[in-house]
Amino acid sequence: MTNDTERLVVYIVSDSVGETAELVVKAAVSQFSGSNVELRRIPYVEDKGTIQEVVQIARKAKALIAFTLVVPEIRDFLLESAKAANVETVDIIGPVLSKITDLTNAKPRYEPGLIYRLDEDYFRKVEAIEFAVKYDDGRDPRGIILADIVLIGVSRTSKTPLSQYLAHKRLKVANVPLVPEVEPPEELFKISSKKCIGLKISPEKLNSIRTERLKALGLKSEANYANIDRIKEELEYAKKVMDRVNCPVIDVSNKAVEETANLISSMFQRN
């Protein structure tokens, strides 16, 4: 692309979702400043009729076809059809399959979508991340029952970032804020105390964190949220709830999120 006005349409054809091809094309496009490229994904292409339609559309639009087709018959048909129609193509996965075959003498399975069917961990991770968002900050007490781990503590004890971090370890985490004026959900006392983790913090550390939070929001640091007496009241209340739940407690005063998450993960595995 020699100037900013040239426009290119790229049809991304795949016998699966098409995410792999799209990511590769996006990575390539990012190398061209001022480029005008439109990506159009066409997933789950498994028949020659669809390929013929795409090739003709691409011919009229003077477009490029980038594809990931693992079935040789379908891949060859696309290449032949595109060549006959003078449509440019990029085979993203074919050369890699051929090279691996040459170097290992192993034969591909030629099954579309295997990366998604085999990668169960990927889906568990996505499910856990969605769970953490849905049951963040005590917004739905049903999450307490469904969760692998429940985090409880006062505001600014890293409950949300911990929930997200642990979700990437495929753990479903709900978190519940403890506030003196709000009765904790009854579900908290129905679950095993072993799957509940209390987070405590020193008053001074929490005061510092909340003061910085208020500054970031453009609010006065004298607000009750960062008042040391109020903080002590909240922490005392939280301790009573944790004692009542009889759950293990982690002091997060001087711990990074990663360190605390690893501790929680280890405790969960032991249980």
UniProtKB/Swiss-Prot annotation:
GO terms for molecular function: ADP binding; ATP binding; phosphotransferase activity, phosphate group as acceptor; protein serine/threonine kinase activity. Pfam families: Kinase-PPPase. It comes from the Bacteria. It catalyses: N(tele)-phospho-L-histidyl/L-threonyl-[pyruvate, phosphate dikinase] + ADP = N(tele)-phospho-L-histidyl/O-phospho-L-threonyl-[pyruvate, phosphate dikinase] + AMP + H(+); N(tele)-phospho-L-histidyl/O-phospho-L-threonyl-[pyruvate, phosphate dikinase] + phosphate + H(+) = N(tele)-phospho-L-histidyl/L-threonyl-[pyruvate, phosphate dikinase] + diphosphate. Its EC number is 2.7.11.32, 2.7.4.27. InterPro entries: Kinase-pyrophosphorylase, PPDK_reg. The keyword Lipid metabolism does not apply. Keywords: Kinase, Nucleotide-binding, Serine/threonine-protein kinase, Transferase. Transmembrane segments: none annotated. It is an enzyme of class 2 (transferase). ADP binds at G153, V154, S155, R156, T157, S158, K159, T160. Belongs to the pyruvate, phosphate/water dikinase regulatory protein family. PDRP subfamily. NCBIfam families: PRK05339.1 (NF003742). Bifunctional serine/threonine kinase and phosphorylase involved in the regulation of the pyruvate, phosphate dikinase (PPDK) by catalyzing its phosphorylation/dephosphorylation. This is Putative pyruvate, phosphate dikinase regulatory protein. It comes from Shouchella clausii (strain KSM-K16).
